[in-house]
Amino acid sequence: MEFKRDNTVRFYGDEKQTIEVGEKRVPLFKSTTAPFMKQEVLPKKSKTRLKIPRFGRFKVFPENFEIERDKILDPGGDAVLQWNRVFLFWCLVALYVDPLFFFLSSVKRIGRSSCMTTDLKLGIVITFFRTLADLFYVLHIVIKFRTAYVSRTSRVFGRGELVKDPKLIARRYLRSDFIVDLIACLPLPQIVSWFILPSIRSSHSDHTTNALVLIVLVQYIPRLYLIFPLSAEIIKATGVVTTTAWAGAAYNLLQYMLASHILGSAWYLLSIERQATCWKAECHKESVPLQCVTDFFDCGTLHRDDRNNWQNTTVVFSNCDPSNNIQFTFGIFADALTKNVVSSPFLEKYLYCLWFGLQNLSSYGQNLSTSTSVLETMFAILVAIFGLVLFALLIGNMQTYLQSITVRLEEWRLKRRDTEEWMGHRLLPQNLRERVRRFVQYKWLATRGVDEETILHSLPADLRRDIQRHLCLDLVRRVPLFAQMDDQLLDAICERLASSLSTQGNYIVREGDPVTEMLFIIRGKLESSTTNGGRTGFFNSITLRPGDFCGEELLAWALLPKSTVNLPSSTRTVRALEEVEAFALQAGDLKFVANQFRRLHSKKLQHTFRYYSHQWRTWAACFVQVAWRRYKRKKLAKSLSLAESFSSYDEEEAVAVAATEEMSHEGEAQSGAKARHHTSNVKPHFAATILASRFAKNTRRTAHKLKDVEIPMLPKPDEPDFSVDD
């Protein structure tokens, strides 16, 4: 039977796995029938115990082991990345501090004599910073013992599997980088400067032991080596050491200055060594009148009488003065002695040495005039080689970082030049060229040459959705139509919004053209006009501002249960009055969002759409105007009818009077003169009656015509269907 250990099984310690037979307790594994379960026979004095197989002897429970695994750091995590940056900084600090130990020794000039001394105050300051840097090296070792690594056998696919076993991590680290890190963290300069050198000087009084500091700086090699794998780890995790191009250029310049700092410090120490060598050579030549002792070169012997007597008669210091005509050649170290660099305060001599290193690295050591000394010649050769290599690296890296700053600007310049050449080749008119130039310039100012769509599409869907929500949600909420929607619908909208840029005078859509997108204004102004008012000469124009939208015909089309393939025609002409930034929803995306709108069981969104739709506003204004005109027509018709009724009454009364007068005229026909006089008076009254009758008929005819004529009305916009399909 094959036994498989499950991660959920809790293994107990030996004190719980063993049972005493004398007490007749039930064995823990009594029900186990595996053949490897054996009973061990113990001596009589001891009680019989049940032997537990080796696989069950775990002192740590699985859940405790998971806790230990949680303490292991991920090499690609933020914590390790931040620590690598901090440790890189302190590595650079340590590399700058170590050469400062060379400046502890100096030459003190007292009249005609000189001596060598040590700057204790400077030594304390340098030791403090060096010790502080050493603590970070020790902490780095501790962190590397707790940092997981990727198994080489699991790199077939993806990142690979992290090994989080502390024992395996420690074993791998001890076999690889532990020795280098251990050597780098040892406080060797402090030990040599404060313990070894003072004891040697007190016993032998030989200041040439400063060369021991050069031997100690062998530790500088592993410290310098640690910079490169550390930078490689940061580049592997983030792609670059620094986040900005200027910081990267400064980082490379800092490395070049570090090399100049090391060169200047070594030149200073070798100058001190060269001065001491000359003193010893001249000291060995003197025998009378007083014996020269190398102890006299130490400033600690200034109080001794024999030293004072010796300095009054010796020629050692005059024979080692480079300004005199002497046989000893100082070579490239003569400037440090003639200009009293070795006797100057710390700041002055440090800056001069830094300038010496920077000058000779940049000129590849061409200004160095060496002597025949082997050490001096080798030093000059190293200066020339390192100067050539480091200067080439500096120029290359600086050029790379600085070009990365202007690469997009250069691409934009090339694109603009190609655009100008194309417009000239195609003989475009000047107005079109100006529009193209304005658009290219405005797009550069808005995006700085960054293709946002490509960046977003390269990200995972969930991350892309969160970014779009962060960028667009607050702006989308400014649109009153979207302010009525829930977060889920807004997420769907933000995910499909695309930025749109329009320059002044650009036509977004023309009246009668198919509507391909719905535009939501974020910045700028648009002019929306239409001539479709149902009658000749109709014109309506409005200004769209931030928060408004256009292309609502597309929303009505998308909300149809069975929308056609043909896109709706625009009822308005939309033109940019200034530079406009907006979000656009394409027809397909709007169709998807519109299907989500059907979940809204409220008329509130429909009323909001009507209120903020400029097409509906125009229709409502025309509707009010038509209603007002209809009211005016009715009022006019009523007044005309009233006037007609009065005119008809006057006409009937005039006809009756005329008939009465005519009858009286026939009854009195016997009197000829009187009858003729009466007939002449009746004819004018009868003519007036006929004219009044005709006027009344014309008035009635005009009223009927006005009543029959209807003023054309603007057609009502399509009603968006916000209901839910059953």
UniProtKB/Swiss-Prot annotation:
Binding site for a nucleoside 3',5'-cyclic phosphate: 481-605
GO cellular component, one term: plasma membrane
InterPro entries: cNMP-bd_dom, cNMP-bd_dom_sf, Ion_trans_dom, K_chnl_volt-dep_EAG/ELK/ERG, RmlC-like_jellyroll
Gene Ontology molecular-function annotations: calmodulin binding; cAMP binding; cGMP binding; voltage-gated potassium channel activity
UniProtKB keywords: Calmodulin-binding, cAMP, cAMP-binding, Cell membrane, cGMP, cGMP-binding, Ion channel, Ion transport, Ligand-gated ion channel, Membrane, Nucleotide-binding, Transmembrane, Transmembrane helix, Transport
Subunit composition and interactions: Homotetramer or heterotetramer.
Function: Probable cyclic nucleotide-gated ion channel.
Family to which the UniProt record says this protein belongs: Belongs to the cyclic nucleotide-gated cation channel (TC 1.A.1.5) family.
Protein name from the UniProt record: Probable cyclic nucleotide-gated ion channel 14
